[in-house]
Amino acid sequence: DRLAIVCRNPEGEWQIINGNQTAMMFVYYIIKNKIALGQLKPSDFLVKTIVTTEAIAEMAKKNNVELRDCYTGFKWIAREIALSEGKQKYIGGGEESFGFLPYDKVRDKDAPASICLICEIAAWAKDQGKTLYDLLMDIYKEYGFSFEHTINVTKPGKSGADEIKQMMADFRGDKAPKTIA
C-alpha cells in the first residue's frame, strides 16, 4: 500500500527518497501539470497529515491551492474527501509514511496509482533532461530546503511495552514536556 523511491544523485550514489520528499514530488507535479493544462481550479484542494512536511503547505500557498491538515492516517484524508464531495475537487494527499492518494476514487493510500504517478513524473522530468533527484532539487530551490532525520527507538519485551505505556500516559497527562530542548 506504499511506494518507496531510490534514485541516483549527481555523484552516482543511490539516494533514498523519504516519504515527505515523495509527497513533495507528487504535489509539485500535480500542481505544475494542472497549471500547464489550464486545469487548476479554485475549488481544488490537497490534504496532508499534521506530521507531513510543511513544504507542501508552501507549495499550496504559492499556487493558491487550498490545503487541509488532518490527523495522521488515511481515514482522516478520506474524511476530508467525503466532506467535500460535490463541492470541491480533491487533487491529492498523503503523509510522511510513504502513503499517497493521487485521486478520490479509493479512500486509502494507493500504491498502484502512486507507482503510475511516479513513473509519469520520472518521464516528465526526463523530457526536461532531468532526473527525479534533479526534480527534488528544483522543488527545494523554488519552495525552500527542508531536512529531517527519523530516529527509531525500540523497547523490547514486556518491560519495553510497559515503559512505552508509561511514556504515553505521561505525555497524555500532566507530565508532558513544556519545552523541547
Where are these regions (language model features)?
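Catalytic or ion-translocation cores adjacent to nucleophile or general acid/base/metal-coordination motifs
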Residues: G19-Y29
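Oxyanion-binding/catalytic loops of NTP- or PPi-dependent enzymes
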Residues: D1-L3
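Phosphate-binding and adjacent anionic-ligand microenvironments
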Residues: I5-Q15, N33, L37-A181
